[in-house]
Amino acid sequence: MDTSVNVDTSSRPAHEPATAPGRFVVRDACHEDLPEAAAVQAVCVREIGQGVIPNDVLTEVTGPGIVHTTIEQWNHFMDDGAIFKILVDRLDMRTVGVAMARVSTSSDAPTPWEIATLHVLPEARNCGASDNLLDACIGNRSAYVWVFADNARAISFYQRHGFHFDTADGAVDDSLGGVELQRLIREDIIESQ
């Protein structure tokens, strides 16, 4: 399996701005979508990890080997009932975002559902597409998500969707070179499913 999926992050044509109605659509992901979705995640992690994750670790955790491992892991999660959604740019039918939620396996989970990933390429940000992706993935479910403690953009995004900081201490992700994480929680939502 070729895991060296390239994702073009160049600017889109001026005649079709990100805010054009219907430019970005959310759909259920299938197994065949996972390589491109994992590549999107790698691009986004490289972006948010700059200056936060040590360079050698960042190169390792966003390289082809990890992308391949992510694809394998996501295939298992999908088979086990995880919810996968992708965001597609209708200009060229590329995947520009991915979201995955699953029933948490953590013993200290504050809610049944965990948002395990939500990443959107820069050209699809700030136009409502990320909001649509999150809504399609978890709807009104109570959920939690771990974010980099200093990722103000992600924290603001989740707070706009009713998430708040967990009162428990954050965590440190040693696999990312000791990055500090913060958990955000959305509770007391009427479950839609």
What are these regions (language model features)?
Residues 6-7, 12-13, 24, 28-34, ...:
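Acetyl-CoA-dependent GNAT
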Residues 131, 150-178:
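Conserved active-site alpha-helix within GNAT-family acetyltransferase domains
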Residues 136-137, 154:
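Short hydrophobic clusters on alpha-helical segments that form packing/core surfaces
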